[in-house]
Amino acid sequence: MSGNRGVVYLGSGKVEVQKIDYPKMQDPRGKKIEHGVILKVVSTNICGSDQHMVRGRTTAQVGLVLGHEITGEVIEKGRDVENLQIGDLVSVPFNVACGRCRSCKEMHTGVCLTVNPARAGGAYGYVDMGDWTGGQAEYLLVPYADFNLLKLPDRDKAMEKIRDLTCLSDILPTGYHGAVTAGVGPGSTVYVAGAGPVGLAAAASARLLGAAVVIVGDLNPARLAHAKAQGFEIADLSLDTPLHEQIAALLGEPEVDCAVDAVGFEARGHGHEGAKHEAPATVLNSLMQVTRVAGKIGIPGLYVTEDPGAVDAAAKIGSLSIRFGLGWAKSHSFHTGQTPVMKYNRALMQAIMWDRINIAEVVGVQVISLDDAPRGYGEFDAGVPKKFVIDPHKTFSAA
């Protein structure tokens, strides 16, 4: 077997499905490995993090094969793989992790110390994350397979819920991580900034964790309408009514117990005029304002160290005008960084299989073909309330 196709980044605003190399049992530096498997990709999703690159807001190089949200079938394995068999259906955490370093042993798999020579942390198909080939493709190599992969135990039942299980690679654990690190528990009042897929996953996770009320804020009316239809309260950030007043109208007080930033560095201002302009510190500053004293703020939204398209010189190197003094005065706790998917994915798999969470409906999963990926990128960038899931082999599109 030698054919393969994938979604390739061709520069700002452009992706294309091209022929790419069939995966080999070797790492990005050409070293042969025996701890990996080759997957036939069953599903692979378009993520907001991919959009940051496609918009030209990172230093991603032309020719990068995109995609880090992957579910697949094991079709080849190295000699050192002991716990997986040919034919197994597996969920792939977006983190590439060795399982051997200090970070991995402490389950900080988002900052593995060995898989990326440039910095801590690796991922598939992402800028500065170790040059691991992306999974928006027909076939993919996964290293350290015994450690990284989550086997889906009942293939037939898993395929019945593949639209939900495909979210286990990233957005559901990422949203859940945001809710957990924000301290969400039974009876919590929660504000989630961002009604995209990660924000909705955070909102659904907060509900799973027992939150009394979840408010989702956004500028996009279609996404707000979708969030409302899923049973969440909403805050329309395009209005001139300040966020704390909208929260007070819902809760009777202007603050929440817990807050989640599911927007990240491409945030825009609030209000009729503010929404017209990018203002990368907006979300963090607003969360400090509306989170009660001693509250927690989870920050799964992506922030970068290099942003070529930033609004000013400071933001180009990830330096933002944050009112940290306000957070200090209110004794806030902040939690940032890449989600350690493996910390949560098995429990969330069970929640899906036992109908405790219907994440595909919440985030608006729409299945498309690999050839339709460029269209999916365009529509997602336009702000439609959908989560595009690519089915490269037409395995379940008609299911």
Swiss-Prot record:
Cofactor: record remark: Binds 2 Zn(2+) ions per subunit.
MF term (GO), any: zinc ion binding
E.C. no: 1.2.1.46, 1.2.98.1
SUPFAM superfamilies the record matches: GroES-like, NAD(P)-binding Rossmann-fold domains
Necessary cofactors: Zn(2+)
Chain residues that bind NAD(+): 48-49, 52, 198, 218, 223, 263, 268, 270, 300, 302, 337, 339
First-tier enzyme category under EC: oxidoreductase
Activity regulation: Inactivated by bipyridine and p-chloromercuribenzoate.
pH dependence (record): Optimum pH is 8.9. Active from pH 5 to 10.
Temperature-activity note from the record: Thermostable up to 60 degrees Celsius.
Alphabetized UniProt keyword annotations: Metal-binding, NAD, Oxidoreductase, Zinc
Record: residues binding Zn(2+) 2: 98, 101, 104, 112
Residues that hold Zn(2+) 1 according to the record: 47, 68, 170
Substrates-to-products reaction catalysed: formaldehyde + NAD(+) + H2O = formate + NADH + 2 H(+); acetaldehyde + NAD(+) + H2O = acetate + NADH + 2 H(+); 2 formaldehyde + H2O = methanol + formate + H(+)
Pfam families: ADH_N, AlaDh_PNT_C
Top-level taxonomic group: Bacteria
Gene3D superfamilies: Medium-chain alcohol dehydrogenases, catalytic domain, NAD(P)-binding Rossmann-like Domain
Subunit structure: Homotetramer.
Family membership noted in the UniProt record: Belongs to the zinc-containing alcohol dehydrogenase family.
PANTHER family attached to this UniProt entry: GLUTATHIONE-INDEPENDENT FORMALDEHYDE DEHYDROGENASE, ZINC-TYPE ALCOHOL DEHYDROGENASE-LIKE
Stated role: Dehydrogenase that catalyzes the NAD(+)-dependent oxidation of formaldehyde and acetaldehyde, and, to a lesser extent, long-chain alcohols, but is inactive against propionaldehyde, butyraldehyde, methanol and ethanol. Can also catalyze the dismutation of a wide range of aldehydes such as formaldehyde.
Name the record gives this protein: Glutathione-independent formaldehyde dehydrogenase
Organism annotation: Pseudomonas putida
